Amino acid sequence: MQQLYDFYILHQCKYKENSLLVSIFTREFGKISGLIRVNKKTINLYQPLVKLRGQISLAKKSDGLSKIYNVEFVESFYQNTYINLLSLQYMNELIYLLLSYSHEEEFLFEKYGFILKNINEINYKYLLRMFELELLDSLGQGVYVDCDIDGMLIDESLSYSILATGFKKNLSTIPNSIAGKNLLKINQSVSLWTDEDLKAISKVTRAYIDYALAGKQLRSRKLLIDYLNLGKK
């Protein structure tokens, strides 16, 4: 019997009359583009934020389409709050835009599943930062805070500027600089982050994600920011 794979739909659109062109996220192969045959009864099954399981026949060519079939429903993670839904859409959009095809992504896949199950209005900012850090690691652009760009250990008593290649020690106070004590928290569990740590780490992941995007725009990020700004008025 052929192996069944768990996966999530990142993006889908209609392809001919009875098929969907999909981008899916898997543990074993990372991101895959493929085709799923559908009918009127099953078409609503293939939506983002739903965990599915099925057989996958990988494309023989790098630019080809895989075939996904014998798909079954596992679990739905549709959230009952708008902020949670936007947060999950943000994760999907990041994976869709940034993740390479056909690379095993066990750690990122497990983090993604954990966040789908546990995100709420209280912890969503923390979990999104955790996801961004894991995604950057998967992209080979991880945030390393052991040393600055000059090879010196990060000092919790100093402040640093964020560069594309790391962190540079500031000789004087500079706007948007990051305290060394907050940078060092990146290596610690999210449960140990303070609100101050979160704000600092958010600046770091924003800078690194923007660098990885190379000018690509995130629709979900804009919606998320606009929604949060409405709450401040």
From Swiss-Prot:
Disulfide bond positions: none
This protein's UniProt keywords: DNA damage, DNA recombination, DNA repair
Function: Involved in DNA repair and RecF pathway recombination.
Organism encoding this protein: Francisella philomiragia subsp. philomiragia (strain ATCC 25017 / CCUG 19701 / FSC 153 / O#319-036)
A GO CC term attached to the entry: bacterial nucleoid
GO biological process terms, semicolon-separated: DNA recombination; double-strand break repair
Protein name, entry field: DNA repair protein RecO
Similarity comment: family membership: Belongs to the RecO family.
A Pfam family matched in the record: RecO_C
InterPro entries recorded: DNA_rep/recomb_RecO_N (IPR022572), NA-bd_OB-fold (IPR012340), RecO (IPR003717), RecO_C (IPR042242)
Domain of life: Bacteria
